[in-house]
Amino acid sequence: MCPVAVLVMGVATGAGCRRVAGENDAVDVTYAASLTVAMANVASRFREQTGREVRGDPRGSVAGAHLIREGVWRPDVYITADPATLPLLGDHDPGWAIVFARGELVLGYGDASRHLAALDSAKAGLLRWPDVVLRPGFRLGRTDPDLDPKGYRAIFAFRLAEELYGPRGLAARILSEPSGERSVFPEEHLSARVLTGSLDAAVFYLAEASQQGLRHVPLPRPLNQGDPADAAALARLEYRTSDGRLFRAAPIAYAATVPLNSPDPRAGAELIAFLVGEDGNAVLEESGFVTGGTVLGDVSRVPALLLDVVAAGDVADGRVRRSPRAAPVDTTPGPSGPTGSPPP
């Protein structure tokens, strides 16, 4: 069975996995739930320009890749919060993707938090945030690291915090769940729990927290995993999922591709072209994202429509840079080797 399409713009209809090319004018997208607000804005602008609706399925990027791999969901575009999830598409991995935005981690919190004053003090630099989240009764939320990159990035941040602040065992204490309390929730539900006060704070991307109207405590480098200059410092950290897949820490990046089982690959390419173009960049920047990136994988497999846009962007403003046969995403010995290789 197929998941219900979540409305991004236009009328939500049945599952996209049964759609065939030409059946309607909608573009189906499975995207990282942290992009929910930004994708609504993208969909609105895309519709104005093309007349086409965008139907979205927001969820953790690992979970979304599994649904596509298993044929449960057949979107025209897959957008991930970590390029390392691309090999999880299996036989539907086209062997290329375009990185179009970057982000960083923060601790997001709302007015309903029981520890509002302490969090405000941490935001102002008057208290250390680990001391705040370890207070008795503090409820810190995060996403499932087996389903969502933000989940394993939170673990990386806590491990780095232990190295920066000490003492030994700090990360384990932050990750521990008090008796009868849950700390791990689906990405698409996390902000609502923070806004209502059922969680005092949670790990978010900066743009995501801003879009949801949350306050935030900034995290220092490299804990925030937002600066490409920290790639080497992050690469030594890794997380192994319950099914044995290994993900390594890397600067946060969003990437988009057209799965090989897309019913309408041209529609998918058109939406990605919009994302990496001037108008798409403007929408993303208005939503708080840092735009720019590169082609990952085999450039020869990238649709000509996209190569035209990427090349134009490189010449015009440098937002997206095209490189001949760019280096593939290295997740070895994780989901698999280069983009385009299915996991075992």
PLM features: residue spans?
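Short beta-strand
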Residues: 57, 98-99
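Exported/periplasmic ABC-transporter solute-binding proteins
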Residues: 17-51, 55-65, 69-71, 82-83, ...
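Short acidic/histidine-rich motifs immediately flanking catalytic phosphotransfer sites
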Residues: 73-75
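Acidic, polar low-complexity intrinsically disordered regions
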Residues: 100-104
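Bacterial N-terminal signal peptides
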Residues: 2-12
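Acidic, polar ligand-binding/catalytic clefts
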Residues: 79-93, 98
